[in-house]
């Protein structure tokens, strides 16, 4: 999971402004390994490892888009959702923009996608779409969190290793 065991790597990759696009699917739990609590699990949300629901002792849900936007490295950060056709079209546009940034060589782009998990929520697909809209949006508001047009950070003069200059500097 990007927000837990991948947290160190994603934060440092973003801070460096690496030229990649990251698409983070946030369904509020670890869906592929049994429905355990994840860093993005909502307060009160029941999971296989929090059967009584997430409580304060377990920490608040991590807002990854806001964390990424707070770093200097990323040039584009947006949170989108998939709960209706309008939102799916917005998600498509955000992903397209993030990939376009790569073709322009501008650096790190991050798109967080709020998604449904009917299996572990034990709801129908339609009910999970409503669940995302009603439960996740208040905690994870949609929208662009960062959009910069600056030049890539690596467009800086190359370091020199001229022996005389290095010796003079030290």
What are these regions (language model features)?
Residues 6-8, 33-35, 79-80, 89-93, ...:
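A short secondary-structure junction signal
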Residues 7-12, 32-46:
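Active-site-proximal loop->helix
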Residues 27-29, 83-84, 113-120:
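Glycine-rich beta-alpha junction loops
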Residues 103-170:
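Flexible, low-complexity linker and terminal segments
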Residues 38-104:
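Conserved thiamine diphosphate
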Residues 19-23, 29, 66, 74-78, ...:
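Structural motif
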Residues 10-12, 38-39, 93-97, 126-134:
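Short, solvent-exposed amphipathic alpha-helical segments in soluble enzyme
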Residues 1-31, 93-97:
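Thiamine diphosphate
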């Amino acid at each position: 999971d990007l927000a837990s065991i991948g947290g160190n790597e994603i934060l440092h990759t973003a801070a460096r402004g690496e030229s990649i696009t990251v698409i983070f699917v946030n369904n509020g739990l670890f869906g592929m390994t049994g429905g355990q609590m994840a860093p993005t699990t909502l307060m009160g949300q029941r999971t296989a490892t929090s059967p009584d629901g997430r409580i304060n002792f377990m920490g608040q849900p991590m807002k990854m888009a806001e964390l990424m936007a707070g770093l200097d490295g990323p040039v584009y950060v947006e949170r989108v959702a998939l709960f209706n056709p309008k939102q799916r079209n917005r998600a498509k546009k955000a992903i397209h923009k993030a990939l376009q940034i790569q073709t322009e060589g501008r650096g790190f782009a991050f798109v967080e996608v709020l998604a449904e998990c009917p299996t572990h929520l034990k709801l129908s697909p339609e009910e999970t779409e409503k669940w995302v809209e009603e439960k996740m949006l208040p905690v994870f508001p949609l929208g662009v969190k960062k959009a910069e047009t600056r030049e890539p950070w690596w467009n800086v003069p190359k370091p020199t290793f001229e022996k005389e200059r290095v010796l003079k500097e030290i």
